[in-house]
Every structure is written in C-alpha cells, then in structure tokens.
A protein has these predicted regions:
Chain B
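Short helices/loops that flank or line small-molecule/ion binding pockets
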Residues: 80-91, 108, 160-161, 180-189, ...
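Conserved N-terminal structural module of periplasmic/extracytoplasmic solute-binding proteins
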Residues: 2-104, 119-126, 305, 340-344, ...
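Short helix-initiation/N-cap motifs at beta->coil->alpha
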Residues: 73-82, 100, 174-178, 254-267, ...
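A local structural motif
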Residues: 64-74, 90-91, 165-171, 221-225, ...
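Extracytoplasmic/periplasmic substrate-binding proteins
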Residues: 206-209, 214, 237-335
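C-terminal lobe and pocket-closing loops
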Residues: 283-293, 306-312, 318-413
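Helix-loop-helix "hinge/cap" segment bordering the ligand-binding cleft or interdomain interface
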Residues: 118-119, 137-206, 216-254, 321-327, ...
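Hinge/lid segment of periplasmic solute-binding proteins
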Residues: 100-152, 178-182, 297-299, 382-383
C-alpha cells in the first residue's frame, strides 16, 4: 500500500528542484548551460531589460535630454486621442491584412512549383532564397526605382501585359498595396519553409487519394494543406507580427530625410510614427507607451490566432 | 601626356599647394590665440572623409587646437547616437549638424549657450549672416556657430526657355500668372506621361520659400508662434500646387522627376527635361562638373513685391552641455568658420579647379566677409558661370531662415504633411494648413511645457 501511495504521488516542487540539481552531476549539463549563458545574457540585457525600462519610462515624460517626471497613464491616454497614432495603427493593420495573405499565397505557389522540380532543385531553392539576403534598407531603395509610376521595372512589366500602371509611391489608393508588394520581395524564406513541409507529407497519402480518384486540386486542398497546416499557422503568426512591426524598408523609402517629399498619411505605419515620436520629437515616454500598446495588441492577436488555429491546424500524432 | 595624367598631375600639385597653404593658415590662426589646449576634442558629425574644402578646413582647425588630439569619426550627425551619448553622460565636445536641430535641443537645455565662448575667443558674430544667426539663436542666446549657407535661386535651362519662347522676364516668381504661362509653354507630355517639366516649384521642400514670397511668415521670430494657415500661406500653397496640377498632376509629375539622373552627366538640364526650378546653389557645382556645357543660368527668386528673396538653411557647430573640452571646441568652431579659413580653402579649390580645367561656381558660407572675398568669378571663366556666381552672391543678401523653435521637427513635419496631403489630393490647401497649424501649435505648447 505504502509503495503504491509513493508511486502515485505527483512530484512536488522539492522533487523537481532535486532532479534539476542532480543534473549538474552530468558534464553535459554544464556544457548546455555554458552555451545558453551568452543568449540568456543578451536576452536579459538587450531585450527583457530594455522592455522593463521601456515600461517604466512609458509612465513618464522622459525625453533623454531634459529632466523627467511621472505622468501616470497620460501617455496611454494620449495615444487614444492622437489622430496620427490611431491613423498609423489603422494603416499598419490594413497593410498587414494585404501583406500576410499575399506573402503566404505566393510562398505556397512557389513552394508547390519547387516541390515538383527534381533536377537542380538545390539551385532553384538557392535562387528563390537569395532575395532574403538583400539588406532591408536596399529593398527600400530599390522599391523607389522598381515601383516608380510608369517608369519602374514592375510598372513596365505591367504595361507589357497591358495592365494600367499604378502610381505606387504617391497614389493613396496604391501606397499600401505597394508596400505589401515590396515586403514580398523576401518571400523566399517562407517558400523554403513551405517546401520543407510539403516534402514531409507522406507520399502514401497522395497515392491513396489518387486511387480514390481525387483531382490535383483535391489532393492539394485535402492532403497538402492539412498536412502543412502547422507550418502555415506558424508563418501566419510570424508574418502578422512582422507586418505590424516592419520599419526599415518603409522608413528608407518614404521617411528618409531626402525622400520626405513622398511621405504621406497613407504610408505612416505605427512603428514609423513610434520612431518619429522617440527620435525626431524626443517623446521617449510616449513612444514607449506606444511600443507597449503594440506589444499588447500583438499578444492579443497571437492569442486569438492560437485559439482559432485549434479548428484549422492538424498536428500529426496529436491526441484529440 | 594624356589628359588623365595631366589631371592627376594637377591634383598632385594642388595637393602640395594645399598642404603649404593649410600649414600657413594654421600658423596664422594659432598665432592669434594664447590658450594652450589639451586632452582630446571629440567631434560628432564631421569626419575626415569629406571633400577638399572639408579636409583642408579640418587640417587648419586641427592645428589651431594643437596639442589637443582630435577624435572625429567619419559620418554625419546621428541623432540616435547623440541621444545615447546624452543618456550615458558621455557627450561629444562638439556637434556638427543641421541648424534646424539647434532650437529643439537648446529649449531642452542640452546645449551650452555660446555667450562666454564668443566673448572669450572674441568671435566676431557680425561676420555671420543674420538669417543664419537667427536659426541658431533661441531665447536671446546663440547656441550654434553657423557654417554653410544654402542659397536658393531659379535654375533655368536656357535652351528649353529659348526654344519655348520663354524669356527671363517671364520666369519671374513675382508675377504668378506670367510664370504659370511660361511653365505651360515649356511643359511637354506624351499622353498622360510628362516628358518635360516646365517649372518645378519643388514642393513640399520649398513651401517656406513660396509662403514668404506670398508675404507669409510661417513662424514667429521667437520660434514659438506658428502661422501656417494665414491667407498668404494658403494662397502660396494653392498657387504652387496649381503649377504641378497644370503640368500633368502630382503623380505623373513626380514619377517623371524621379527618373532624372540628378548627379550624372545625363542630368535633367543636359537632357532638357526641365525648364526652370528653384534649387540650392550647390547644384551649379554638380552641373559644372558633370555637364559643364549645359545651357544654364540663374535668376533670383522674387517675392510678390518684386524683391529677391532667399530661403536659407545650412549647418552649424554646437557644444553640448557637459562637454569636457569646451575651450578647444570653441576655438575649433571659430577657426572652421572664420573668413581667413574659408579664403584659404577656397583658393586651394580654385587653383585645383583651374589646373583640372573645371569651372568655379562659388562657395557659399554663412560668413558674409568670406563670401565677399571668395565668390568672385575666376579669370577666363565662361560668362554663364561668372553670371551665376554673381546672381547667387547677390541673392544671399535677401535671405531669411526659419527661426529656431523648440519643436522644429514637429513643425517641419506638420507643414510637410500638409503640403503632401494637398499634392495627393486628400485635402484642400485651407484644410491642410488649418490642420498643420493646430498640430504645430500643440507641438510647441508641449515642447515649452515645464
């Protein structure tokens, strides 16, 4: 009886601590921690530390250059009444709503094409991935050339197809789609992820579907998509976060001091406005409040995505 | 000997001459001060990789503060780095930046007022142009020593003007109706695409110039009271915007302008892609070096009253509060901006240009004494370049600048956004400038709140 009682007892905190401490008798444990320390140090100092500091100054009127004092929740209240903060948040949401499906759709298309390539597949994977290596600032600069009215490379291509060329840089109706198109330049990263996921789909599932008379579209819809849904979900979350936080390319294209002539209310994204508040206007406290608000918004969106994903994402081997 | 080797030889000789001149100028400069400098002078925003004028002045100023060492990393002023330096209480001794920064940082107490520096080093402030001084003066104190001085005149492609039947008299900003007619005469298009801009008003950048030309002062002299939505400012924006809308509309206009090879030999003047536009004086130097045979002239920008006006911007030197080597910083600023230094480096450049067969198009500084001495056409120079130097030099006298403001960046953003909203057809000039006025008032109020 006593033995049975011990066997069914759930391990308490003391047990877990003893087990953790006993791990240090192993040499490998020390090595593992040795490798983790640099990352942990970087995280504490440059991420967690900065976040905590940001949270503190979000309740002050800190400007770096002048003495600061506590302002309570004033910065957070000011965000709600600042028309540019709200406008930039709306712009970021709209641009992300265009960008994420566009990027995922294109990456899936490219991955599906690459999955069929059997010769020189390594070469093609490299070619598709190469644009990911382009510095983001260079992408912003190239955007101005490639999307310049009827003269840019993209517009000339559209003209060749007899599609009217939009003024991506200056027409308020086309600025956000243009920015989304610019971000898709780095689609190769997700293409490679999707390709790996597609290659992992068991062939027998396709064979069984074919025997049942499923068309190529049904095989894709009912076999490929469910089987790669964890990867799709992962990229969906990551791209949403990226879309809401993207800065470099848009700043280079529209807000570089020499390009101020094309900045507009439509191109003003939330993180750009946050940067202006912090480093152009020296409103560090307000900018920190904006950063924490964005963090909260992203957390809520991610939690919602995870909740919804339970209906759509299939994890192989998962017990339901 | 090939032309290439001749040019290399010319520059080598010019280099030797420069070394001798710089040494002499430094000896001249250092003989005037009795203070012994020590330690290191840390400079932000002015490195050693600039052009010949920057390098030669650097050498002169370096000798003037010797035996103090000079630490001047390459790269322009970096606001983020500067803020980090302030936060860590490790400020540079000297910053070289755009004059528009001065008011904001002065208002927040991050800069040293230069009264004692000016007094102790006997810096003659009367040599600096009033417009430049105004943009570095906040609350009655000078916080920066002005250096370069941008002069904006109309650059005219005379080939385009002549072949379009446009005379110099028609390109008169004092007469908006005739100017618009001239713009449309020079403007060309193919369907909806612009193939030549007749007259580019340079919006949004030059809105302050247009506003002033129409009689508006968009910011009070103390930098605390914006007046962006005055009837004159609204009229100015309405007119300047109408010039663009009449020449294909903003989208087509800007898309075409973005195709220009601005710094190359196939620039918009060389290819006759523009009739006229207001521009800073440094662009004449670009034209003289990249396409010296272009048909170009300069015309002063005039206000509606017919008087020439110039919207001036430029750079300045300032000493952050907490600088450890303020004495050397003060001497450095004085040396970099005094007339003898400018004359020395200008003479070196003139000699180098003459030997290389390049045309002298002037060097325009915030020091009026220096400009009077150096901005004279060189002998044997083609008339067009000589005439341009004279026009720019004359325009300098009619300069205004936006006063130092505690919220310069927000003020500039407010009117830039307003102009862009008008250009993109999102608001009327009245709506846009009313909004800009509200934003500017709120920004300055917040910046001055204790």
């Amino acid at each position: 009886m006593a033995t049975a009682a011990v066997a069914t007892r759930r391990p308490g905190p003391g047990d877990r601590a003893r087990r953790w401490a006993s791990g240090f008798r192993e040499r490998d444990t020390w090595w593992a921690y040795a490798f983790l320390v640099p990352w942990a140090f970087g995280f504490v100092v440059f991420t967690a530390g900065a976040m905590v500091w940001g949270a503190i100054i979000s309740f002050t009127n800190y400007s770096v250059v002048a003495p600061s004092h506590s302002v309570g929740l004033a910065n957070y209240r000011q965000i709600a009444s600042d028309p540019y903060a709200l406008l930039s948040l709306k712009n970021s949401f709209e641009m992300t709503a265009i960008y994420v499906p566009f990027e995922m759709g294109l990456a899936l298309l490219f991955a599906s094409m690459l999955a069929r390539v059997t010769r020189f597949d390594g070469f093609f994977r490299t070619v598709y991935y190469l644009p990911v290596m382009t510095p983001t600032v260079a992408i912003g600069g190239m955007y101005l050339l490639m999307f310049n009215g009827p003269y840019g490379l993209v517009d000339q291509f559209l003209g060749y197809l007899h599609i009217p060329e939009p003024y991506w840089l200056t027409d308020p109706n086309w600025i956000k789609p243009g920015i989304a198109a610019m971000l898709v330049w780095q689609v190769g990263g997700n293409t490679v992820l999707y390709l790996a996921a597609i290659k992992n789909v068991p062939q027998q599932l396709y064979e069984a579907a074919s025997i049942d008379g499923a068309s190529a579209w049904r095989r894709f819809k009912d076999v490929t998509l469910p089987m790669i849904s964890p990867t799709l979900f992962f990229t969906f979350v990551i791209l949403t976060v990226y879309g809401l936080q993207v800065f470099d390319q848009i700043y280079t294209a529209f807000y570089n001091p020499s390009n101020a002539k094309i900045s507009s209310d439509t191109s003003l994204m939330y993180v750009i406005y946050l940067f202006q508040q912090a480093f152009d206007y020296l409103h560090m406290g307000f900018a920190s409040a904006m950063a924490w608000l964005l963090f909260g918004i992203i957390m809520v969106i991610t939690a919602f995505q995870i909740l919804v994903s339970k209906r759509f994402v299939y994890y192989e081997g998962e017990q339901r | 000997m090939s032309r290439r080797w001749k040019a290399i030889g010319a520059f080598a000789i010019a280099g030797v001459v420069a070394a001798i001149a710089v040494t002499a100028a430094a000896a001249h400069s250092s003989s005037k001060h009795s203070t012994t400098f020590s330690g290191t002078l840390n400079i932000m925003g002015f490195g050693t990789n600039g052009d010949d004028v920057a390098k030669n002045r650097f050498a002169i100023a370096q000798k003037a503060v010797a035996p103090a060492k000079v630490n001047a990393p390459n790269g322009g002023f970096n606001e983020q780095q500067f803020l980090t330096d302030i936060a860590s209480k490790q400020v540079p001794d000297l910053v070289y930046w755009d004059r528009s920064y001065v008011g904001t940082y002065a208002a927040k107490g991050a800069l040293m007022p230069l009264d004692s520096c000016i007094k102790s080093d006997k810096i003659d402030t009367s040599q600096y142009r009033q417009a430049a001084l105004q943009s570095v003066t906040y609350n009655g104190h000078i916080y920066g020593i002005p250096e370069f001085f941008d002069v904006r005149t109309l650059i005219v492609d005379t080939h385009v003007a002549d072949t379009s039947g446009v005379t110099g008299k028609m390109l008169n900003t004092a007469n908006p109706t005739v100017l618009k007619q001239a713009a449309l005469k020079m403007y060309q298009h193919s369907g909806s695409q612009v193939t030549r801009i007749g007259f580019d008003p340079k919006l949004p950048e030059f809105f302050p110039l247009w506003a002033k030309a129409f009689g508006a002062n968009i910011l009070s002299k103390d930098g605390l009271h914006p007046d962006l939505n005055s009837p004159q400012a609204i009229a100015a924006l309405t007119y300047a915007n109408s010039l663009i809308q009449a020449q294909g509309g903003y989208n087509a206009f800007l898309a075409f302008r973005n195709t220009w090879d601005f710094f190359g030999s196939d620039n918009q003047v060389a290819k006759n892609q523009v009739g006229a536009w207001p521009m800073e004086e440094w662009y004449y130097n670009v034209l003289a070096s990249s396409s010296p045979n272009v048909n170009v002239t300069a015309i002063p920008f005039r206000s509606k009253t017919g008087d020439p006006i110039n919207y001036s911007t430029g750079s300045a030197w300032s000493i952050p509060k907490g600088a450890k080597n303020a004495a050397a910083a003060c001497q450095w600023m004085k040396t970099m901006t005094n007339a003898s230094t400018w004359e020395t480096v200008a003479n070196i450049r003139k000699a180098a240009y003459a030997k290389a067969g390049q045309y002298w198009t002037g060097l325009f500084t915030a020091n009026s004494k220096a400009d009077a001495a150096i901005n004279k056409p060189t002998s044997g120079e083609p008339k067009k370049w000589a005439s341009i130097i004279n026009t720019v030099e004359a325009a300098e006298k009619y300069s205004f600048a936006l006063p130092a403001s505690p919220a310069s960046a927000q003020f500039n953003t407010a009117w830039t956004n307003a102009v862009n909203r008008v250009l993109q057809g999102q608001q009327s000039p009245t709506q846009a400038l009313n909004q800009a006025q509200k934003e500017a008032v709120a920004a300055i109020k917040q910046a001055t709140k204790k």
